[in-house]
Amino acid sequence: MLGRAPSKTLQTEVVRTVFKADPKIVLAAVGPELNREPTLSRMPLDLEPVDGLHFEDLAGLFVSTPFNHGIVGMTIRQVAYIFGLTRRSGAKRAIEIGRWRGGTTVALAGAMGDGGKLWSIDVGEKEARVFHGRGLKFDEETREFLDRFGFDVELIVGDSRTLEVETGEVDLVLVDGDHTYEGVKIDVERWGRRVRVGGALLLDDAVDEPIFGSHAETAGRVMQELLDEGDFALRAQVDRLAHLERVR
């Protein structure tokens, strides 16, 4: 019935009204569509556990969707994978393309720990566009949090398509900026190829997400081109995130 409503605005208002009246009704309807069968036999272990189980190994215990995005716009499994991979690989030099509230910036810096160096690059327009200049300063909050723990992170505001930053070869690059085909392609060519052989290139929104959608038609297309060229090999897909290893 709702699918025949005359507009998305009306559909949204109907759902909002029902949710305010009785949230359990909405959860009962939506929950089964989002949750895989909740059994340990079906729990994903995205990272191979080493030295026992760590918290990032337990991310599969949770269901995470855009409904519970917070500071970071990724699922629990994605952030756990990024953190665990970075820490276990011993990565100490990383580049992040695309920064919003600072969630993955903190995750990467925390995983590298002492001696780590992160270059985080963002064009810096989203905050003003989304909040209409209401004075929210996410980069200031991110800087304060990073300084609290002594992390070495450069929060760079600039266009990743043209910006010149000397980083040298790095261990890991996370691309989560411009999601157009051209934008992802440029970011991969300019920054992703700085990954050393054996290092990790992480592409967010490269894997199709059937309910909420991703950018598989653009980021996924770039991923497939990289695999076809042979310089990178696919190592894992975690929700919308693709992990590629530089092999030559």
What does each model-found stretch correspond to?
Residues 58-60, 65-248:
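S-adenosylmethionine/decaboxylated-SAM
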Residues 1-63, 248:
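Membrane-proximal basic amphipathic "stem/tether" segments
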